[in-house]
UniProtKB/Swiss-Prot annotation:
Organism whose genome encodes this protein: Thermococcus kodakarensis (strain ATCC BAA-918 / JCM 12380 / KOD1) (Pyrococcus kodakaraensis (strain KOD1))
Protein name in UniProt: Adenylate kinase
Enzyme class name: transferase
Quaternary structure (record): Monomer.
Residues engaged in binding AMP: 31, 36, 57-59, 83-86, 90, 158, 169
Region named LID: 124-161
Entry GO MF terms: adenylate kinase activity; ATP binding; zinc ion binding
Length: 224
């Protein structure tokens, strides 16, 4: 089972991706994780990508395509791609790779939330720069405002979590996703799920769809 999962900032797609990975035994490939690892390495490429993100801009397609395709070459089947492709050029790169290697996508899933929900979820996030603990000023606040419960360090707001940056990211996402959604809808594999509400409620909307696809794939393998 090969899945693409999309969603605007704060949609919860990465959380659901990990649940899907664990439940269905898929390999999780996240464009965000690959980018963050490169930034943490403080390589010249990482610094270049960090500059784009701090402005709320998308990282150039050539960079993202290289990161993702390199990862896919090590995992031909049974994957979930989180946050990729997100531009028409990335779609072309991915589709060419899949065609060349005889790989079929089963689902392009979008978890949708509106712009104000995206801003509330993301701009309230606070990170501990020392131990990596994550908080939210509304949904998961620290015991002492601005201070990490775990190590006592002062919490920070990441540059790309600021409200003005989140709104810019949301609008870029919405604009770029229009042709991508149209493409995968035409292929008959696009499904949009309402991402509003608690994670557990959203999962109840997603799971029946994945169970159906998983069951279909298992039956297909039995008859091969």
């Amino acid at each position: 089972m090969n899945i693409l999962i999309f969603g605007p900032p704060g949609s919860g797609k990465s959380t659901h991706s990990r649940t899907i990975m664990e439940k269905y035994g898929l390999v999780y490939i996240s464009s965000g994780d690959l980018i963050r690892r490169e930034i943490e390495r403080k390589s010249s490429l990482g610094r270049e990508m960090e500059a784009y993100l701090s402005r709320g801009d998308l990282i150039p397609d050539t960079i993202v395509n290289t990161l993702i395709i390199s990862k896919l070459r090590r995992q031909r089947e049974n994957f979930i791609l989180d946050g990729y492709p997100r531009t028409p050029e990335q779609v072309i790169s991915l589709e060419n790779y899949l065609f060349d290697h005889g790989i079929k996508l089963d689902l392009a899933l979008e978890i949708f939330i509106d712009e104000d929900t995206s801003v509330e979820r993301i701009s309230g996030r606070r990170i501990c720069p020392n131990c990596g603990a994550v908080y939210h000023v509304k949904y998961n606040p620290p015991k002492v405002p601005g201070i990490c419960d775990v190590c006592g360090s002062e919490l920070i707001q990441r540059a790309d979590d600021r409200e003005e940056v989140v709104r810019k990211r949301y609008r870029i996402y919405s604009k770029n996703m229009e042709p991508i959604i149209k493409f995968y809808r035409a292929k008959g594999i696009y499904v949009r799920v309402d991402g509003d509400g608690p994670i557990s409620e959203v999962w109840k909307r997603i799971q029946p769809l994945l169970d159906y696809i998983h069951s279909r794939e298992e039956k297909r393998k039995e008859h091969e």
